[in-house]
Each structure stands twice: as C-alpha cells, then as structure tokens.
C-alpha cells in the first residue's frame, strides 16, 4: 500500500467510537504508512479499502448491511474479506452449509419462522436441550438455552 492509500476501519452508528484495540490496529497500520480512518458503514465511506471489524449493529439491519456490501463492491472498493463471504456469514444458516460440506460444527438446525414446534424439532433430533439463536445476531443477544421438559420460548421472537 502506498502513502496515499486509505483504509477505513468500519464501525457502526450504534457504536461509532473505535475501541482501544481498533485504535491500536490503526496506529500499527499508520506506522507502516497506511492511512486509516474510522467510519460507520451506514455513512457509506468512499475510501478505496474497507475493513468492517466493528459493524456490530448489522444484525438490526441485515438487508441494509448486505446492500452496503454490494454497493461498495460495485463501486470498486476493496474489502479484506470478499463481500459475498461476509454476506453469507451474516446469517447463522452458514453453519448448516458448512456441515453439508463436511466441516465439523456444532449440530445445527435452521428453523423457518413458520415452523414453531420446538418440541418436535428437539424430538426429531434426539436432543433433550438446545441453544436457540436468532438467524442474524452476535454477542449472545437473543441466545437462550432450552430443555425439552420446559419449553417456554416463543419462536416468533427469532427472525
């Protein structure tokens, strides 16, 4: 990268201020001649290189985030990870995709919104307990552990 190269370390509007570790990364990059800026993905930064490390609120607006990835790529901006990979990784169904390809992942079942009979799913899988997660999310938000004997989860709460 040349001295004119600018890399945006992407944050989000919910948490726009960079964390200490992000500031440390920026200082390291700057010491190597890479100019860095911090900007929220919702601001559509127009720099040539994008590294979305702290786009923590994407789960609240997954379609808007997916569109941002697509538009930035179409505009010729470069991501460290391919936008298609990031879009695929946003939704927890990627775990099922990995399992189908032979990767060892925690046993996972994707439950469409219409299917709300959690007891049936647990029974079919032979599970006495399970962890329920939203399809889009991170940091444990909306994650709950359930037991077959006491199912009090409203599956409609998990988009």
Regions inferred by a protein language model and the residue ranges of each:
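ATP-binding N-terminal substructure of ATP-dependent carboxylate-amine bond-forming enzymes
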Residues: 1-80, 85, 93, 117
